[in-house]
């Protein structure tokens, strides 16, 4: 077969593509040396036209072709979707196999708004997912194999120019803790093995090897329900190396939980928050405005209650406005006119009000689901709801002061601002029967957050033996800013600048002098245990612990 002759005489399309990529890199290097900013898309279009190419070179090809001596300079500029690792870690979402919702046994049906699952129109999808979200599609391609899902996603992020030294897993796909113990162990074992390259026979062995892996697992997040967040579940999750829970709350109203067929009470939510925080977990809740029989006023009221009532007060929130999807009970209500979604402008208004209520110690992880618009019959009409809500807040003169909005990495990407004068700020509050202290390094003038630490004086009811009898626990330590490989120090990035150590010293002082604790514990991701060993901590059960003299 003859090679495809391009318009430049004898070269094939592949050769022209190589010349285009080389030219793009050459121009990028020149622009860097002259200190100029370059619009990459314009540059690709112009260079492709110059060589008569029908298609532009892919970003992955350009990143792969950057010479070694320029990689440090150019790859950060070429990085696709820099937000992916702006918070300091690469997040890898994996899905467990499709299984039925556990509360079908005693409520007779799934939640009224819930799509997906083995009995739905989307039969190969997990419960509450349609199978068309990016994560679901990756999981289906890998046939829900945890090892393959992890390897493929890590490789993909690498090719896009991200540093994958630190990985955080999110285990999605319905109630993971409702699956059999054998399957759960197999799943978690494979996640750790995919990073360490070892083949383990048990979870404890996988965790041991994962501690020493080059790609560190800095945390695992598991999605669960309040009734699958009891003491035995929490202990299992600690043994997996899990550090954060995503608990489906959806509404703080008892009547709404009953009408939507949740299968648990609001009291169960408060109890699971209490137990989870006393075991050291970070608690992220899923909330759904616009559910049936609520209305705008009650929706606003429930978020005031949610952030101000000490029985709730989560560390993070995912805000999922209700969507009407074919095949759900809600779809039938909508079709017969018994349910109506808010209009787009009302929804933007409501989300703007909710974001204004968020306290500075809570992080809003997501606003709206990742479900493709063609599958949505009614509900959110915009793909960029958070941006629209933030713009509406600007008009109203309010601001969103949650953790994510103020992070140094995100501020740099969106507003090109860097912190100038950094100081330690302390906020104390009471939540779920314990005394919480939120320590952070911030630039108060520009309202930028560099690092944070969550410290808790455990309540008397803590069920873990390691945390009984006057123990303080560090539930989270995180320095923001783009991922910096663990072995290197980059003076322009904020990770590995010693902020973490300063925050830990202050936490130890508060635990000793104010809490009157005899020891301090840290719930640490498997891959970060060595960091705490350097600070004088040692492993006791699943926690890193240090005696306070």
Curated annotation (Swiss-Prot):
Acetyl-CoA binds at residues 166, 476-479, 499-501, 532. Its EC number is 2.3.1.311. It comes from the Eukaryota. Keywords: 4Fe-4S, Acyltransferase, Cytoplasm, Iron, Iron-sulfur, Metal-binding, Nucleus, RNA-binding, S-adenosyl-L-methionine, Transferase, tRNA processing, tRNA-binding. GO terms for molecular function: 4 iron, 4 sulfur cluster binding; metal ion binding; phosphorylase kinase regulator activity; tRNA binding; tRNA uridine(34) acetyltransferase activity. [4Fe-4S] cluster binds at residues 101, 111, 114. Its main location: cytoplasm. Pathway: tRNA modification; 5-methoxycarbonylmethyl-2-thiouridine-tRNA biosynthesis. Residues 84-374 form the Radical SAM core domain. CDD domains: Radical_SAM (cd01335). Its cofactor is [4Fe-4S] cluster. Residues 398-549 form the N-acetyltransferase domain. It is an enzyme of class 2 (transferase). GO terms for cellular component: cytoplasm; nucleus. Belongs to the ELP3 family. Catalytic tRNA acetyltransferase subunit of the elongator complex which is required for multiple tRNA modifications, including mcm5U (5-methoxycarbonylmethyl uridine), mcm5s2U (5-methoxycarbonylmethyl-2-thiouridine), and ncm5U (5-carbamoylmethyl uridine). In the elongator complex, acts as a tRNA uridine(34) acetyltransferase by mediating formation of carboxymethyluridine in the wobble base at position 34 in tRNAs. Stabilizes transcriptional repressor snai1 by inhibiting its ubiquitination which promotes neural crest cell migration. This is Elongator complex protein 3. It comes from Xenopus tropicalis (Western clawed frog).
């Amino acid at each position: 077969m003859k090679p495809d002759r391009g318009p430049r005489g004898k070269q094939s399309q592949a050769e022209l593509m190589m010349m285009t990529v080389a030219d793009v890199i050459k121009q990028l290097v020149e622009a860097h040396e002259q200190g100029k900013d370059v619009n990459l898309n314009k540059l690709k279009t112009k260079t492709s036209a110059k060589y008569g190419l029908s298609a532009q070179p892919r970003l992955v090809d350009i990143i792969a072709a950057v010479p070694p001596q320029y990689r440090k300079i150019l790859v950060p500029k070429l990085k696709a979707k820099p937000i992916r690792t702006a918070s300091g870690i690469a997040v890898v979402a994996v899905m467990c196999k499709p299984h039925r919702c556990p509360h079908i046994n005693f409520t007779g049906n799934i939640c009224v708004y819930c799509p997906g699952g083995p009995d739905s129109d989307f039969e190969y999808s997990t419960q509450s997912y349609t199978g068309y979200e990016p994560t679901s599609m990756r999981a289906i391609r890998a046939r829900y194999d945890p090892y393959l899902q992890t390897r493929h996603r890590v490789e993909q992020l690498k090719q896009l120019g991200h540093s994958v030294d630190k990985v955080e897993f999110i285990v999605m796909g319905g109630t993971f803790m409702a699956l059999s113990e054998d399957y759960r162990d197999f799943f978690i074992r494979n996640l750790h093995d995919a990073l360490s390259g070892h083949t383990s026979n048990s979870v404890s062995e996988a965790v041991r090897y994962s501690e020493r892996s080059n790609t560190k697992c800095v945390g695992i997040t598991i999605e669960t329900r309040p009734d699958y967040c009891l003491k035995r579940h929490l202990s299992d999750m600690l043994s997996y190396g899990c550090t954060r829970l995503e608990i489906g709350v959806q509404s703080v109203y008892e009547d709404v939980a009953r009408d939507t067929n949740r299968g648990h009470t609001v009291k169960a939510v408060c109890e699971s928050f209490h137990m989870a925080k006393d075991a050291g977990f970070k608690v992220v809740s899923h909330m759904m405005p616009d559910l049936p029989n609520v209305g705008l006023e009650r929706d606003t009221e429930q978020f005031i209650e949610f952030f101000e009532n000490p029985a709730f007060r989560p560390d993070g929130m995912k805000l999922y406005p209700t969507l009407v999807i074919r095949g759900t009970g809600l779809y039938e209500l909508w079709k017969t006119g018994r349910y109506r979604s808010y209009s787009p402008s009302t929804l933007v208004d409501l989300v703007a009000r909710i974001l204004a209520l968020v306290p500075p110690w809570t992080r809003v992880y997501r606003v709206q689901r990742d479900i493709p618009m063609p599958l949505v019959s009614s509900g959110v009409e915009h793909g960029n709801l958070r941006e629209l809500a933030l713009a509406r807040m600007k008009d109203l003169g309010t601001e969103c002061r949650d953790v994510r909005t103020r992070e140094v990495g995100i501020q740099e990407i969106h507003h090109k601002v860097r912190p100038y004068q950094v100081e330690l700020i302390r906020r104390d509050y009471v939540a779920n029967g314990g005394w919480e202290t939120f320590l952070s390094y911030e630039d108060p003038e520009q309202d930028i957050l560099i690092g944070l630490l969550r410290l808790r004086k455990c309540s008397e009811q803590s069920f873990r033996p390691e945390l009984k009898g006057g123990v303080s626990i560090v539930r989270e330590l995180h320095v923001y800013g783009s991922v910096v490989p663990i072995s290197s120090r980059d003076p322009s990035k904020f990770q590995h600048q010693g902020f973490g150590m300063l925050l830990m010293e202050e936490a130890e002082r508060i635990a000793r002098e104010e809490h009157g604790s005899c020891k301090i514990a840290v719930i640490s991701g498997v891959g970060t245990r060595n960091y705490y060993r350097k600070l004088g901590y040692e492993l006791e059960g699943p926690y890193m612990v240090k005696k306070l003299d």
